[in-house]
Amino acid sequence: IVYGSADGFLYAWKPDGTNVPGFPVNLGAPILGSIAVGRLDGPAVQLSIVVPVADGSIHVRLANGSGRPGFPVSLPPAGIGQGFSPALADMNGDGFTDIVVASGNGRVYVFDRSGAQVAPWTVSSRFSSLTSDATLASPVVADINGDGVNDVVVGDENGSLAALSGASGAMLPGFPIAMAAEATGTPALCDCDGDGMTEIVTVDFGGTLHVWDYDLPFSPAGPAPWPQFH
């Protein structure tokens, strides 16, 4: 069990309740978002623990508690963020897993396994007109426009649902979709009705459940690595 706490410590326990060697680890600021665990270096390599911290930094720890080279990284501009929950997906087609974060400044940032930013998720990747407190939701990742590149879907506090192209970082046609209340829930991507096409599902702050048909095939066996909250 791996757990991030508001006391700034990252904990890891064995099934018998004892600490995993190397844990807990003090990351220096509260851990308010959900952590993500995945194999950044490929399927045969040890797990990495990706931790969003309230000072706007993203830490990556290995299974023994040691830090991964190149991390922590800060969401630009430095300090923006309250520990937004990351998604893990290959965003540039190099066969390795990247870290996807929707920041409070209204932009999506992607970092590779070395901590470097992944283009085009640097300048053109705005999902919201808000420049602070833009979202409490986590991004989800799948190829929803059929071009073979993973796209990012995320909601914002203005009540809109954005979908950004993995090829360009720009808003996909037909988005953003307006809702009557803040899009605080993390969306999910699925074939909900069995028609072979993609549906986008989310809940707004007013408690309304939204489901949209998206007229392209849903292919979970393909590049749909993070289609819902983990």
Model feature map: region roles:
Residues 1-230:
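Extracytoplasmic/lumenal domain signature
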